């Protein structure tokens, strides 16, 4: 089964899609594709067949998203917690991943046609070496495509992602690339696996479970959360439309909350900068200075220096992460 299913919407689906596109269309949707095992039990087939049908549904859902103008999709494919399942099920899931990432390498023409960039987010060092290699090749093969993006969260949990981002910032301080005062929510956001993506507009979980299961906890603080009872392999175009309509009904409130949060984050950073400038002036014996121009000059210099350090650190971090892909490329050459 292909990663991208070709084909047009039906006449009725196109009619409804045009109505939906008259309102605010989400740029980025995240899916917790839950219900594969229950689907297998319901249909009296092997669990592995349930997971295979789940992948097939992903390919179909990506086609719907493309037709609706949704250009970024993130899916929860394999949690670190999944390693605790039975050996046979874990082995089956990893074998399915091997098969699908190998298949992806055979679909270069289709991926290029649609401009699909594949990103795999997670602690990939937890995976078998041969699967790491297949994933690295898939990322490398599509990294220059930029029409639409598929983020596959594999060997992932949000807590692990956040802890890793904190370790990266600590590494930056240890290396002298950052000052401890440079550490902030904004910088942590840029150290996440998902740092190249906007936060999801909608998070959809199927199967009726009403929990996030350690998925994108940081990124979905201002997302529309949609919990649907349908099992993932039975997901339909109409289920997707229902979720988008729910997002559209709440779009104004969500956007207002995002804007307020962004302003609050800027305000807190300005307060920290002003406190740092005051401390500098006190150390220099200028605490009584009422020179507003001096304070503005110091404030501008402080923020400029911080931005230079942060950008230097982020470039070093990007290079460090890219080295993993480069090593696999060298190994296979």
Swiss-Prot record:
Disruption phenotype: Embryonic lethality. Conditional deletion in retinal pigment epithelium causes deficits in the retinal pigment epithelium and the photoreceptors, leading to retinal degeneration. Conditional deletion in rod photoreceptor cells causes retinal degeneration. Keywords: Endoplasmic reticulum, Lipid metabolism, Magnesium, Membrane, Metal-binding, Transferase. It is found in: Endoplasmic reticulum membrane. GO terms for molecular function: ditrans,polycis-polyprenyl diphosphate synthase [(2E,6E)-farnesyl diphosphate specific] activity; metal ion binding. Disulfide bonds: none annotated. (2E,6E)-farnesyl diphosphate binds at residues 34-35, 37-38, 85. PANTHER family: DEHYDRODOLICHYL DIPHOSPHATE SYNTHASE COMPLEX SUBUNIT DHDDS, DEHYDRODOLICHYL DIPHOSPHATE SYNTHASE FAMILY MEMBER. Belongs to the UPP synthase family. This is Dehydrodolichyl diphosphate synthase complex subunit Dhdds. It comes from Mus musculus.
């Amino acid at each position: 089964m292909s990663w991208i299913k070709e084909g047009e919407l039906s006449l009725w689906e196109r009619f409804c899609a045009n109505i939906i596109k008259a309102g605010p269309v989400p740029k980025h949707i995240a899916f917790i594709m839950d219900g594969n095992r229950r689907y297998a039990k319901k249909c009296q087939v092997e669990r592995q067949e349930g997971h295979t049908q789940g992948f097939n549904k992903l390919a179909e859902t990506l086609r719907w998203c493309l037709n609706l103008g949704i250009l970024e999709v993130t899916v929860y494919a394999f949690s670190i917690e999944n390693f605790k399942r039975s050996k046979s099920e874990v082995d089956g899931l990893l074998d399915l991943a091997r098969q699908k990432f190998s298949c992806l390498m055979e679909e270069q023409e289709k991926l290029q046609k649609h401009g699909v960039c594949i990103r795999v987010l997670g602690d990939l060092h937890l995976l078998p070496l041969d699967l790491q290699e297949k994933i690295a090749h898939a990322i490398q093969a599509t990294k220059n495509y930029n029409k639409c993006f598929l983020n596959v969260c594999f060997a992932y949990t949000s807590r692990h992602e956040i802890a890793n981002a904190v370790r990266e910032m600590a590494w930056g301080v240890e290396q002298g690339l950052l000052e401890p005062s440079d550490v902030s929510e904004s910088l942590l956001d840029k150290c996440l696996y998902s740092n190249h993506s906007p936060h999801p507009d909608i998070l959809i979980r199927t199967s009726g479970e009403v929990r996030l299961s350690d998925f994108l906890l940081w990124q979905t603080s201002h997302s529309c959360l949609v919990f649907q009872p349908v099992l993932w392999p039975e997901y339909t175009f109409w289920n997707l439309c229902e979720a988008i309509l729910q997002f559209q009904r709440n779009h104004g409130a969500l956007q207002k909350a995002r804007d307020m949060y962004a302003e609050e984050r800027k305000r807190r950073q300005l307060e920290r900068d002003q406190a740092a400038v005051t401390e500098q002036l006190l150390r220099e014996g200028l605490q009584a200075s009422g020179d507003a121009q001096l304070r503005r000059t110091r404030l501008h210099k402080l923020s400029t220096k911080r931005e230079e350090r942060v950008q230097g650190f982020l470039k070093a971090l990007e290079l460090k992460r890219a080295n993993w892909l480069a090593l696999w490329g060298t190994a296979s050459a």
